């Protein structure tokens, strides 16, 4: 479960474009830039964000069984799950599990 934070750079616009491409199979995605990072929403549900060029989503019961690595988005924050899949269908499946838990 080793949650760690070890970076001090903001997320790049290129990384945002890459992640938005990965999220094409998830409907109603939008984002908000905040303090050099990006918050990600699905139909107005905040489910995660981009932190130091890492795609992190909130920890929810449905994702606990997925074996995802936990990381800190920034010092003092709660751990979040790192999404490192590159398959759009798999990314959509994981994101919708989080969103459904948060609704």
Role assignments for model-derived ranges:
Residues 1-103:
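Charge-dense, helix-prone N-terminal extensions
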């Amino acid at each position: 479960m080793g949650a760690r934070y070890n970076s001090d750079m903001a997320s790049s616009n290129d990384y945002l474009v890459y992640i938005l491409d990965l999220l094409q199979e998830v409907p109603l995605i939008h984002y908000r830039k905040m303090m050099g990072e990006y918050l990600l929403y699905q139909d107005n549900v905040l489910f995660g964000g981009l932190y130091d060029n890492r795609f992190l989503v909130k920890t929810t019961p449905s994702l606990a069984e997925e074996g995802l690595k936990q990381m800190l988005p920034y010092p003092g924050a709660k751990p979040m799950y790192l999404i490192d899949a590159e398959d759009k269908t798999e990314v959509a499946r994981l994101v919708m599990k989080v969103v459904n838990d948060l609704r």
